[in-house]
Amino acid sequence: SKEDEEYKERALTATFELQQGRRGYRALWKHIMNVSVADLKKNYTNLNVEFDLWKGESDVQDIIPKMADAMKEEGYAYYDQGALIVDIKEESDTKEIPPCIILKSDGAALYTTTDLATIMDRMEKYHPDEMIYLADKRQELHFTQVFRCARKTKLVNEDTRLSFIGFGTMNGKDGKPFKTRDGGVMRLERLISDINEEMFRKIVENRSVKDKEAEGTAKIVGLSALKYGDLSNQASKDYVFDIDRFTSFEGNTGPYILYTIVRIKSILGRYAQEGGTLEKGVMLAPVSESEKSLMLSTAAFNGMMEGAF
């Protein structure tokens, strides 16, 4: 669309007509959504992630007209060059904050519009104390506009907290956004598959196990590699996803931690076989600085877990 203005115009028109409920467009859109959501749920299930609600922009499409009319009637929104906007600049601003566009000149809604309508919907249904948005850190200006507009137009209560948590991007070894070997955008399903394949290769290479058993183990260890590799980096910073490093059984990796847990369980298992029980165990004083350091680190575990939560 950057090079073909006619195509861009047709796309904008189609978007507007879809938002207005054109039947053929809506039917096609619903089919695409059903296929996409089913695939998303499958991928999230593979990551042991569940959501209580599955909602999209279209769920608030019907309340946008009511919201826009209220903003106009209460004097918050006005037309400028055909677009409906709300000024959100503040005296304390050190840089220019553009106005919040509610409706484009052709009447079409934007991400800003649906985000505001979603806030309105959540306030009416759930009355939350706080709403936390997690998105690419490059969306910071967008959410600054949305939050300011929501407060100015009284979509939220004065004491309702609106928070944005920006995260960095997962990049390849070249420092650019992570892609497939053929240069395409890396899909989550493909990423999970690649990691599982790499873990399977390493497990079969280093241990004599049956393929079926190795496949099951690869999925468990692969999940730890992906999750730990992502969470071990500061959320707001970009990082390089190196599949060789993340799937390694050495160093600060998910597979290494699982390997360590297995070793600990093995030691405890042998201890139990010899008649020992942890319940009757006695805490011994450390006999070296390394033991003391380990015990202090272990004692801090509960506090670290509470802080992370």
Question: For the regions a protein language model found, what residue spans apply to each?
Answer:
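Non-catalytic interaction-recognition regions
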Residues: 1-309
